[in-house]
Amino acid sequence: MSDTLNRLAEVLEERKQAAPDSSYVASLYHKGLNKILEKLGEESVETIIAAKDAQISKDYSDVIYETADLWFHSLVMLSALGQHPQAVLDELERRFGLSGHDEKAARQPSA
């Protein structure tokens, strides 16, 4: 896994023990999963809007910035759920060489 993701995962874990007023991430953890998910939803919308704008303007700086926010808040969510980014990377690795249609067909049906 990239050094950046490892370092970020370590910081996110440290922030779980921090006082809510000591950092943005600590405050998110303190507010709970619903607040983290709300923020993740906001970042998703901002990323979509930035992508649409970039398609027209050909300026990709905002979509890169917003995607970084989206990834960051996704990592906060995973950390809050006790999951490490490596689990996502492992899943992506598992999908290499597997067609998207085959992967979707192989999933267990949701209840």
From Swiss-Prot:
Gene expressing this chain: hisE
Chief location bin: cytoplasm
Keyword Nucleotide-binding attached: yes
MF (Gene Ontology): ATP binding; phosphoribosyl-ATP diphosphatase activity
Keywords from the UniProt entry: Amino-acid biosynthesis, ATP-binding, Cytoplasm, Histidine biosynthesis, Hydrolase, Nucleotide-binding
Localization, UniProt: Cytoplasm
Catalysed reaction, written as an equation: 1-(5-phospho-beta-D-ribosyl)-ATP + H2O = 1-(5-phospho-beta-D-ribosyl)-5'-AMP + diphosphate + H(+)
GO CC, alphabetical: cytoplasm
Broad enzyme group: hydrolase
Protein family membership: Belongs to the PRA-PH family.
EC number(s) on file: 3.6.1.31
GO biological process: L-histidine biosynthetic process
InterPro entries: HisE, PRib-ATP_PPHydrolase-like
Pathway connected to this protein: Amino-acid biosynthesis; L-histidine biosynthesis; L-histidine from 5-phospho-alpha-D-ribose 1-diphosphate: step 2/9
Protein name: Phosphoribosyl-ATP pyrophosphatase
